[in-house]
Regions:
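Acidic, His- and aromatic-enriched active-site or binding-groove loops in soluble protein domains
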Residues: 95-113, 137, 149, 170-218, ...
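CE4/NodB-like, metal-dependent polysaccharide N-deacetylase domain
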Residues: 132-156, 217-219, 254-270
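Alpha-helical scaffolding segments of alpha/beta enzyme cores, especially the outer helices
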Residues: 134, 138-145, 164-171, 285-289, ...
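Active-site and substrate-binding clefts of carbohydrate-active enzymes
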Residues: 2-59, 69, 80-81, 195-234, ...
Length: 332
């Protein structure tokens, strides 16, 4: 019997560079380590941000078959300070990023690919309450200025979060965020009476193929939806040179699909966006290859997190570890 279950695919890229401007000059000085470029912003833009906006799909003898704006097909966030720099120093790439979000809205039932980001990339659990709200509000305002819409999701620096951070996101109108699987503590089925038993997932074994709902501990009327990315596949993209071969990349994504799941599953990964071209040369081309040439043929439905939530909803509740991030074994 044919399996009619859907398999969604979301690839998220977190694109960020720290502010490098000399505060006295309000410009970036020459950075010798970025040679042959003027500075590291310029170098990473040339190696990653621009190529992903005009990424090539080629034959084995390097004949160009298509040119793809990868941002039209992936979930992404850009640091506000990075976009501020790009607006002035890489305007054409900047415009293609904004255009990609507009194009994605029509493909995803009114939901754009772009997510907002806390403004200064600070570790939110270490911030006081006022600074938490400031970072979120500034991030939202910057997003609205650039993308001309309200953000539905927000990326947390290093995915660092705690209960107070998630409550602040909720209070500011954010609907979802993305975390590491190792940040989840326990899950249970959502029921009206809340009597389902909790299952321990604290060692990173949460099922990443669905969304989860988190309720604020001090006020159960407040909730936010959380996605926990596929850890092993994300790690391979970031550290195992998976992006040197588009065929290996799509095979790894297919390995994230399980026939044992009796629901419409979401295969999704999240890494630093710089993986696609800066960390791995021509990684943008492996990405465009699987997005435009392979994903649909392999049974994937390309989507973003907001559209997935509208289509599939949330059936499970999650509790998270008290203070955690994707990059620190002892929390933050």
């Amino acid at each position: 019997m044919k399996d009619n279950k859907k398999t969604y695919l979301t690839i998220h890229g977190h694109f960020y560079q720290p502010p490098r401007e000399n505060p006295w000059l309000e410009t970036i000085e020459v950075q010798d380590s970025a040679n042959p470029y003027h500075d590291w912003n310029a170098r990473v833009t040339a190696e990653c941000y621009t190529p992903n906006s005009v990424s090539k799909i080629v034959t084995q003898d390097n004949k160009i078959l298509d040119i793809v704006n990868n941002y039209s097909f992936i979930s992404f966030n850009f640091g506000p300070t990075l976009l501020s720099w790009m607006e002035h120093y890489s305007p054409y790439s900047y415009e293609r990023i904004i255009k990609a979000d507009v194009e994605s809205i029509s493909k995803n039932n009114g939901h754009g690919n772009a997510m907002a980001q806390v403004y200064n990339h600070i570790i939110m659990p270490l911030a006081n309450k006022r600074d938490k709200y400031t970072q979120i509000i500034w991030g939202i305002k910057d997003f609205q200025y650039r993308f001309c819409r309200k953000p539905e999701g927000m990326w947390l620096a290093e995915t660092a979060c705690d209960d107070a951070t998630l409550e602040a996101l909720i209070d500011c109108g954010i609907k979802f965020t993305v975390l590491s699987p190792h940040q989840a503590k326990s899950v249970r089925k959502l029921t009206p009476d809340n009597k389902e038993k909790w299952s321990d997932v604290s060692w990173g074994n949460i099922d990443p193929a669905r969304a989860y709902r988190y309720f604020v501990k001090s006020d159960k009327t407040k909730h936010i939806d959380l996605f926990f990315y596929d850890g092993p596949i994300s790690k391979s993209v970031a550290f195992d040179e998976l992006l040197t071969d588009g065929n290996k990349f799509i095979s790894k994504l297919k390995a994230g699909v399980s026939k044992d799941r009796n629901y419409n599953q979401l295969v999704h990964i999240a890494t630093d966006g710089e993986s696609y071209g800066h960390h791995t040369k021509f990684g943008d081309m492996a990405l465009s290859y699987i997005l435009k040439a392979r994903a649909e043929d392999e049974g994937f439905i390309l989507t973003n997190y907001a559209n997935y939530l509208e289509q599939e909803g949330v059936q499970y509740e999650v509790d998270i570890k008290d203070v955690s991030s994707w990059s620190c074994a002892h929390g933050v």
